[in-house]
Amino acid sequence: MIQQESQLKVADNTGAKKVKCFKVLGGSRRRYATVGDVIVCSVRDVEPNSSIKKGDVIKAVIVRTRRHITRKDGSTLKFDTNSCVIIDDKGNPKGTRIFGPVAREIRDRGFIKISSLAPEVI
């Protein structure tokens, strides 16, 4: 579960390393986000010479959470980190590579490009 002030790692090659969530999109008073949800973030840490600068406000989709995901068949899944992928306004990833596995729920939510770029879909 991701909420306001949560810090996430960035799992793509856009140049941002860490972001801080300050809004969960989808509803007037929505508090928590999970895998596949879109959040609005502020960039907190960047690599040198990257196109994204510190303090930029961006949209991102969550691809991994430490909180377990319960699937319809009863199985659960959780990851070691809270991670996201930076997207543009149309929902396409800004980066050209994605690092680490992503959950299958990403494809179910309509982010097919992200799931195809990922090295492993769990």
From Swiss-Prot:
Single Gene Ontology BP annotation: translation
Keywords: Ribonucleoprotein, Ribosomal protein, RNA-binding, rRNA-binding
Coiled-coil regions, chain positions: none
Pfam families named in the record: Ribosomal_L14
Gene Ontology molecular function terms on file: large ribosomal subunit rRNA binding; structural constituent of ribosome
Statement: the UniProt record of this protein carries the keyword Ribonucleoprotein: yes
Keyword Ribosomal protein (UniProt): yes
CC per GO annotation: cytosolic large ribosomal subunit
InterPro entries referenced in this protein's UniProt entry, alphabetically: Ribosomal_uL14, Ribosomal_uL14_bac-type, Ribosomal_uL14_CS, Ribosomal_uL14_sf
Gene3D superfamilies: Ribosomal protein L14
Subunit structure: Part of the 50S ribosomal subunit. Forms a cluster with proteins L3 and L19. In the 70S ribosome, L14 and L19 interact and together make contacts with the 16S rRNA in bridges B5 and B8.
NCBIfam families: rplN_bact (TIGR01067)
Assigned protein family: Belongs to the universal ribosomal protein uL14 family.
Function: Binds to 23S rRNA. Forms part of two intersubunit bridges in the 70S ribosome.
Protein's recorded name: Large ribosomal subunit protein uL14
